[in-house]
Amino acid sequence: MKPPPTCAIMREMIETNLAGKLKEGLPAELIGCLEAAAKLAAERGLRLYLVGGVVRDLLLERPNLDLDLVVEGDAVALAQGLAGTAAKITTHPRFQTAKLDWAGFSVDFTTARSESYDRPGALPTVKPGSLESDLFRRDFTVNAMAVSLDADRYGELIDHYGGRSDLERRLLRVLHQRSFIDDATRIWRGLRYEQRLDFQIEEDTLNWLKRDIPMLDTVSGDRLRYELECVFREAQPEKVLCRADELGVLKKMHPALAADGWLRDRFRLARRLSLPDSPSFGLYLALLAYRLSGQECDGLIAGLKLSRPVAQVVRDTAALRANIKTLSYPEIRPSYVYRLLHGLSLAAVTAATIAAASPVARQHLEGYRHKLRYVKPTLNGDDLISMGVPPGPRVREFLERLRDARLNGQVASRRGEEALLREWLGEAV
């Protein structure tokens, strides 16, 4: 059973003006942006609203500094007017949107609009509309609320579709039964919100979600990859992935993917190893793909249209997994470990360190991550040539042999390297 809403939420369910919440929940720089935007909108006879997730999170008393402003009028022109003195701007005229970089914060401006979809999975066709139509195009009722920024209604909460009531009941509800057909990526968004906010997906919404899972086949690889990136930015992405696996959603990324207790434990360990940072997209993806075959990894790479560096992480992970048995032998020399792992992406090595079942293999992988990969001879190519090594491929060969000697503990100083090189040169005569 879900816990009852906090007193703070109950209070806000009764209060319909959030002016105080705005002041308490946003930094002064963003309040300044809202005030400047509202003033300019009033001068131009436009109505301006704060919408979406930030309104939801104000009611939940959760931090959210991503501001979305909707203008009943020309949002791009309004943003350009603000950008003239205090901000940088990026515009997208096709979608009637603009993004301001205001005092280091990102603020999105959108013309109130309605949307239609030519086919499932397509990007929407947009046309100017009312605030009500703009809110109706949102994914869930809890994200379909607005706060007026007009001087005569400042802070007034606008809730046409029952978002406050669903917040109170901790429910995620779509606005109409074709929502997932129009945009199947809302399935992934719903799972993220469900786990992040500890909400439940409303019964009809869950039935429609299950019904429309095949619609994910209409979504491009680029958009699916973006949804996975968003999952990995969650505090506990494994919860989202396990829920997606439970519902059959994860298989639409690739039929061989699985999210279970094994993955949950590895993701948690990845976060501990990555402190104070968060794990990279590549590391999380490498762990998710760790149990896939090489051929299955190729399918995942193609399906998600992964960039070349990230694709290499996935391929390196598959290659490493194939070598885990070799790395499980305690007697292999450090130089051999180096040769097996050198040139592979660090994210793949880290993933194998986390995922490998063999303690010996993990020890070899840890040794490479923390020590072996940094080892190199003191002597350089010029030193070798001055000592009699002929220019050409022999220089590289001797440098590699010196590195191996360092790795295996045969030498520990420049003088030792020089002595060993003279010995090798004497043998070559």
What are the functions of these language-model segments?
Residues 2-429:
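Catalytic cores of the polymerase beta-like nucleotidyltransferase superfamily
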